C-alpha cells in the first residue's frame, strides 16, 4: 500500500483501535492514516452504551456527527440530544463531556489536533 492514500471500511478498520481511523496513535506503517493533525472515529454504540465519567481537561476541538440513532451528549455547558441524521455538536478545548447512546447509534467523531492523552 502507498504511504499517501488508503481505501478501507470504517467499521472493519476501526475494530483495531476502538473505532479510531486516523490519529497520532496509529503507527507510521499506517501511512496517511497516522496523523498529528486530526483524529477521526467511526463509533458504533448499542443502546445503553455510554461514558458516565466525565472526560476532563480536553485540549482539542471536537465535532460529533450523528449518522443514525439517538445520542445524548452531556457537556459542561448543558445536555444535548442528537436525534436526527446529520445532527451534530462542536465543542472546544476545556469543555468536559460524557455521553450515552439512547438508541443503537452510529456517530462520527473528529478531533483536532491529535494529541497524546
Per-range role (PLM):
Residues 1-47, 51-54:
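A short, N-terminal "cap"/entry segment at the start of jelly-roll beta-barrel domains
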Residues 32-34, 51-58, 75, 81, ...:
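Short histidine-centered beta-strand/loop micro-motifs
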Residues 43, 88-90, 103-117:
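A short hydrophobic beta-strand segment most commonly corresponding to one strand
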Residues 56-72:
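Short, conserved beta-strand element in jelly-roll/cupin
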Residues 67, 75-77, 101, 109-111:
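Residue-level recognition of conserved beta-strand positions in structured domain cores
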Residues 77-94:
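Short acidic-glycine-tyrosine-enriched beta hairpin
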Amino acid at each position: 500500500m502507498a504511504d499517501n492514500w488508503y481505501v478501507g471500511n470504517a467499521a472493519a478498520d476501526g475494530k483495531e483501535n476502538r473505532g479510531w481511523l486516523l490519529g497520532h496513535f496509529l503507527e507510521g506503517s499506517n501511512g496517511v492514516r497516522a496523523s498529528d493533525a486530526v483524529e477521526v472515529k467511526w463509533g458504533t454504540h448499542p443502546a445503553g452504551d455510554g461514558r458516565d465519567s466525565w472526560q476532563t481537561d480536553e485540549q482539542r476541538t471536537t465535532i460529533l456527527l450523528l449518522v443514525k440513532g439517538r445520542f445524548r451528549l452531556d457537556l459542561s455547558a448543558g445536555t444535548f440530544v442528537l436525534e436526527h441524521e446529520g445532527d451534530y455538536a462542536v465543542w472546544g478545548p476545556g469543555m468536559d463531556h460524557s455521553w450515552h447512546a439512547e438508541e443503537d447509534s452510529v456517530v462520527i467523531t473528529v478531533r483536532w489536533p491529535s494529541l497524546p492523552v
